[in-house]
Amino acid sequence: MIRNGHGEAGGAKRPGPRARRAVRVWCDGCYDMVHYGHSNQLRQARAMGDHLIVGVHTDEEIAKHKGPPVFTQEERYKMVQAIKWVDEVVPAAPYVTTLETLDKYNCDFCVHGNDITLTVDGRDTYEEVKQAGRYRECKRTQGVSTTDLVGRMLLVTKAHHSSQEMSSEYREYADSFGKCPGGRNPWTGVSQFLQTSQKIIQFASGKEPQPGETVIYVAGAFDLFHIGHVDFLEKVYGLAERPYVIAGLHFDQEVNHYKGKNYPIMNLHERTLSVLACRYVSEVVIGAPYSVTAELLDHFKVDLVCHGKTEVVPDKDGSDPYEEPKRRGIFCQVDSGNDLTTDLIVQRIIKNRLEYEARNQKKEAKELAFQEAMRRQEAQPEREIDCDF
């Protein structure tokens, strides 16, 4: 079991009546290509109790029931550990959630989104805990899924960027990607994310820098927020005894200018929520200037500016975007020790394109079969309810 020990970054414990026992909540899943939809589910689950434990499945279990994961289990364990609402991570959690698992970790109940998770033979993985009344449901985040993100990478369009309409080509692909012929269901597929100020408020800490804290500024795309970003931010966080890390996120068009192709894969609003969910980040500047200006440094009272080992592309006028912090002597290059980049993730996906598309079609076929079985069961008279899936 991996325990998170970053104090307020993990969410302060809520004081309650002294006699009240802490409510322990269980979540589990693959958490492959972690995005703000996963983070939002964990945020909602954490709000239902006092202590959140998250079980993460192994590569072997995922391959058996769903298909090949994009990230290794070690990468996925660390990604979940970095989400600020998570108190503990349980590696190698069983794919089917049982009462034995809940009891082993002293959890009162488990929480899952209002979608369906099925085993390789088409059974509900939460069947046992549902029947025992130890299952709670939270609202699934609309507009984001691993299926959608994979589709964006494979189609290579810019339709998902924040200032552009969805093209007819992307809409057609979004409607069909990973779909099994002859039907579709509400759980697998693509929909558009609608950003609201309330969602940002829910993810933000709302905490201002305090006296004695070191304000550290980092900037970039933080696209497909991944373990490489986490390792970098963890190193940055460890540079000060009391760090306050501000992440500046560039506009989509700015990212596309220096990255090219159809980058960023996630638009600015989506990237904002992904970064806000990280326990090492205190604040996000939405649409930060590419060059770190004197105005920005003075406004946020920045003590230190950090950049990783990736190449620094000159600004449009040919200047060094870190010229001002270097002039002030507050620039620091940080080696995260992790070479993973968004480009490498996209390469993993493209290399295994057929496997991922087949995985999504297989997943939806199971979900449709389950839906139909449930529909038939509900249509039968009570005395005949004995449906064998």
Curated annotation (Swiss-Prot):
Modification Phosphothreonine occurs at: T341, T342
Matches recorded under InterPro entries: CCT, Cyt_trans-like, Ect1/PCYT2, Rossmann-like_a/b/a_fold
Reaction(s) this enzyme catalyzes, per UniProt: phosphoethanolamine + CTP + H(+) = CDP-ethanolamine + diphosphate
Gene3D superfamilies: HUPs
Single Gene Ontology BP annotation: phosphatidylethanolamine biosynthetic process
Transmembrane parts of this sequence: none
Chain residues that bind CTP: 221-222, 229-232, 259, 307-310, 336-340
EC number: 2.7.7.14
Keyword set includes Phosphoprotein: yes
GO function terms (MF aspect): ethanolamine-phosphate cytidylyltransferase activity
Pathway(s) the chain acts in: Phospholipid metabolism; phosphatidylethanolamine biosynthesis; phosphatidylethanolamine from ethanolamine: step 2/3
Keyword terms, alphabetized: Lipid biosynthesis, Lipid metabolism, Nucleotidyltransferase, Phospholipid biosynthesis, Phospholipid metabolism, Phosphoprotein, Transferase
The protein's enzyme class: transferase
GO annotation, cellular component aspect: cytoplasm
Family to which this protein belongs: Belongs to the cytidylyltransferase family.
Function recorded in the entry: Ethanolamine-phosphate cytidylyltransferase that catalyzes the second step in the synthesis of phosphatidylethanolamine (PE) from ethanolamine via the CDP-ethanolamine pathway. Phosphatidylethanolamine is a dominant inner-leaflet phospholipid in cell membranes, where it plays a role in membrane function by structurally stabilizing membrane-anchored proteins, and participates in important cellular processes such as cell division, cell fusion, blood coagulation, and apoptosis.
Cross-referenced PANTHER family: ETHANOLAMINE-PHOSPHATE CYTIDYLYLTRANSFERASE
Identification of the protein by name: Ethanolamine-phosphate cytidylyltransferase
Gene that encodes the chain: PCYT2
